Amino acid sequence: MLACLTRGNLLDVLQEGFNEQQLQAYVAWVNAQLKKRPAVKPVQDLRQDLRDGVILAYLIEIVAGEKLSGVQLSPGNQQEMKNNVEKVLQFVASKKIRMHQTSAKDIVDGNLKSIMRLVLALAAHFKPGSSRTVNQGRDSRAPLQSHRPHCATAVAQGAAAALADVCHDMSRSGRDVFRYRQRNSSMDEEIENPYWSVRALVQQYEGQQRSPSESSCSSLTSPSPIHSAKSESIITQSEEKADFVIIPAEGIENRTEGTDSPLSRDWRPGSPGTYLETSWEEQLLEQQEYLEKEMEEAKKMISGLQALLLNGSLPEDEQERPLALCEPGVNPEEQLIIIQSRLDQSMEENQDLKKELLKCKQEARNLQGIKDALQQRLTQQDTSVLQLKQELLRANMDKDELHNQNVDLQRKLDERNRLLGEYKKELGQKDRLLQQHQAKLEEALRKLSDVSYHQVDLERELEHKDVLLAHCMKREADEATNYNSHNSQSNGFLLPTAGKGATSVSNRGTSDLQLVRDALRSLRNSFSGHDPQHHTIDSLEQGISSLMERLHVMETQKKQERKVRVKSPRTQVGSEYRESWPPNSKLPHSQSSPTVSSTCTKVLYFTDRSLTPFMVNIPKRLEEVTLKDFKAAIDREGNHRYHFKALDPEFGTVKEEIFHDDDAIPGWEGKIVAWVEEDHGEN
């Protein structure tokens, strides 16, 4: 970088403690580069001329050989100026140029420190070859230095002077820490080893041995290394006022960032606050730490001086041959003092080695503790990993179980869907069957309505027959009257004309009854075997049978009245009517026994082979008749089922089936109505 910065003025840049000479040096270097572009005006003020970014873009184009694109050569507002500076900073970042953190806003606002940092970074990165190093400057100015000491006494006196100068600097550091740090930083930039002054003395001593022609010993005129360094720095500054010396950027960064002083830490970019803003307590603590560090360095310097005085070399330098305890021609008291000093030096070194050993042991214990802690932490982490693996295994097992459950549920869902489809099909079939049955029911209702109409016709015909029967009975009464009046003339027989009329009436009644039976048979065949309309047909058939029975009873009574007087030819009609009843009954039927006593029970039963009911009389009271008596009365072979008409208090008229022979048979209106069906063993 610039020569003024290489001799301790970098802290001035960091602290903005600029002087006019430094600013002019920066301006001169920038103008020297801009002379390569005659069209560009030279720079007068760094704050004003570089804040728009145009001069910086020209400077990059000159020193780097690359032209920045998108730069506004005549920015009209702050935003365009900021954009130009941001492009410059982006170029610096893309080239990986080492520079303290700088923002575009600082440069646009005219922050001189940020501008000088940027110029410093560009000069250090792109113009390192044109500079002269500090060491070369020293070599060129070597003849200007003072003469070297020529004996060990002069070396000791020079070391004492250097030690006194260091103590004086340390005493001044407590009063003015900033000035001391500036001096210390200027010295550290040249020589970084704490034994730099001692090494300078050793080099002078060795130079004296290499040049034996210089034999004079002058201790009072030999300057201290510190003053020599100071004078050298002053000479360097005076020589380089008109020239610019660029050093590598790595050295600048190492000196500015690698320093351990609190001042450099306070002024590091990005810190929360500056050194001037810290409280006085923190300043005192920092000064105390810094003084302790300086004391340690002073102790090391004293030890090095003592070793130099006693052994003729530094402690860290390797000695090829051991030194003798006593030198010839030396006073014994001086030898004793030297030996005592060596013993003290050895004891001091022994104490230092012990301290180093204790420190190493403490570090070893700390490392062992850290190792144990890390081992314990590793064990805990292994345990945690095992637990996580177990949890992962359990999670995988749960996942597999859930997957299996999902598969089972999916299978059940498919089965349910299949059953649902089958149920839908069955429901559709049942709907079709229901529609068919509904159609059949409508057809049956239509037929039933026809039957009801036919029944009405039959009832009308029956009423007509009743009228005819009444008319016939009236005629019979008239004939009986005529018979009584002509009994002597007819000799107990009716007139032939009367007999012919009765016969015609009986034949007509038989034909009407046969017509009713045929109609009921055809109506029964139109229904299925378990149709509920059979009950209606049975009731109708029972009513007709009861009506015929009453007619038969009336006819029988009339015949009994006439039997005493004359045998009427109309008995032949009655015998023809009785032929429809079963002749194989053991008990006398109602047709063969005209008079039924109160001890007999009339039984009317139907069979599945004939639509015409059968009637028998059982010589027992109604409540005493059992199933065994009924079976003996009808006398039918094979297995049969017996149903009897009964009155249920809840459902009304029902058919009750009797199984046991000893069970009593229910009655219906003073008689027994039964249905006998053959049992084929299906149920």
Swiss-Prot record:
The keyword GTP-binding does not apply. Residues 127-300 are annotated as: Actin-binding. Residues 279-452 form a coiled coil. Pfam families: CH, DIX. GO terms for molecular function: actin binding; gamma-tubulin binding; protein domain specific binding. Keywords: Actin-binding, Cell junction, Coiled coil, Cytoplasm, Cytoskeleton, Developmental protein, Lipoprotein, Myristate, Phosphoprotein, Ubl conjugation, Wnt signaling pathway. The keyword Coiled coil applies. GO terms for cellular component: cytosol; focal adhesion; glutamatergic synapse; postsynapse; stress fiber. Ubiquitously expressed with higher expression in cardiac and skeletal muscles. It comes from the Eukaryota. Residues 207-235, 482-509, 556-594 are annotated as: Disordered. Residues 20-127 form the Calponin-homology (CH) domain. Phosphorylated on tyrosine and serine residues. Polyubiquitinated, leading to its proteasomal degradation. WNT3A signaling increases DIXDC1 protein levels by inhibiting its ubiquitination and subsequent degradation. Residues 211-228 have a biased composition (Low complexity). Residues 600-680 form the DIX domain. Residues 482-492 have a biased composition (Polar residues). Gene3D superfamilies: 2.40.240.130, Calponin-like domain. Positive effector of the Wnt signaling pathway; activates WNT3A signaling via DVL2. Regulates JNK activation by AXIN1 and DVL2. The coiled-coil domain mediates interaction with MAP3K4 and inhibition of AXIN1-mediated JNK activation through MAP3K4. Isoform 1 but not isoform 2 binds filamentous actin. Interacts with the complex composed of DVL2 and Rac. Interacts with AXIN1; competes with MAP3K1. Interacts with MAP3K4 preventing MAP3K4 interaction with AXIN1. Directly interacts (via DIX domain) with DVL2 (via DIX domain). Interacts with gamma-tubulin. This is Dixin. It comes from Homo sapiens. The lineage of its organism: Eukaryota, Metazoa, Chordata, Craniata, Vertebrata. The gene is DIXDC1.
